[in-house]
Amino acid sequence: QGGCNDVLSAETTMMVKERFAETYGPPVHTIGWGGSGGAMQQLLIAGAYPGILDGILPTLTFPDAISYFIDTAECRLPLRRFLNGRNPPLSDDVKNAIGGWADWDVCERSLGPRPNRIGPDDCPASIPLDARYHPVDNPGGVRCSIYDGMRNVFGTRAYDEVEPTPVQPFGRSPQDNVGVQYGLEALNRGLIDTGLFLELNEQAGGWDIDFQWRRERAAADPDALRIAYETGRVTSGSGGLATTPIIDERNYLDHVANFHASYYSFVMRERLVRDNGHADNYVLQRRMAPLSRADENLALMDEWLVAIALDATADHAAAKVVGAKPAALRDACWNDDGIEIVEPAVFDRGAIFNNTQGRCNELFPPHAGARIVAGGPLTSDVLKCELKPIDPADYAVPLTSEETTRLESIFPDGVCDWSKPGVGQVPNTRTWLSYGPSPVNRYQ
């Protein structure tokens, strides 16, 4: 699978482009095109290695792999385990309120069974079974998590949380859920009661480096956090993306409980707004299959890039990108009859359980995820939150002294302070980093 290694993907793209230039001559411009994992690759390559791709056409967008793994990991272990195992059983409506999903099957049948990219057993068929890692039978075997596959980026360390004691160092992991109050906004909107909120967070637990459930919350490696942000493995709105033309065509799948949730497009847009003050180089189009804008968007991207190339002014590159955008490129959606509705794409953070503001949101309402319901930002890129003391003012429902004491025992070090950037979180301003063996522009 390549382990979602976007650095390898960037190098591969660069080599293909080089081969094309040697065979046919220099390309006029290079346009990224693809969905889901292909969207991740485009955004990560354009952000961390600007110039390989001149413009990008992502579909079924995820901003990057690592922040997307927050949703898959938390559904797969803490939430799915608790929500399915509770007695008496919980209704699907209650489960959806805790996760923010359009339907419980988003977690149960779509996110939950996804390939375990952060676990050691996500190996391609080319690696023989007897060569693969097992904590008891083959502790020195090949580990296939994204972080083990990117050891030259994330580095390694000894982990003593696995039994028996490992005989090899493992790739550093930035995944974390310390201080996360699952279901907080569901509690504050009256969708769950205090007893369930406390029970959920008391029993959610976390996972170890082998992605096995444990009672303790998952704790990120501090160096892995720093590396994830500084190197652009978590996509920010800065770096190369600040000057990249982006047309995001979103095939709406929320209604069929597909993990390609439409809110990820709004996540990417919000990162651009946060880091650049705007997202004017980003166009969001929403529609339902079988309608497709692929041919039209390719032609519009070509027109956009030609106009940028013809701009001989001394303006900053970001201003040229915005100024050259074709007039026909606007946020829009298309109804079942193929009629275009032009209006700004809006995600109302205050209406995550009923995001139907505007005609396009009425047709294609974006939903959320468990971290959003836990109070996290729409940028959805806080891997590990800063902590703060428990504050009764954060809860719309008054807590009794017994409930407060119980909450303090669940979160002895405090709860997430979502008003602050994540631990180690910085914009990605260093591009074209390398990871050895060449010393040129090597990340340290």
Language-model-derived ranges and their functions:
Residues 1-444:
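C-terminal His-loop and adjacent cap/lid subdomain of alpha/beta-hydrolase
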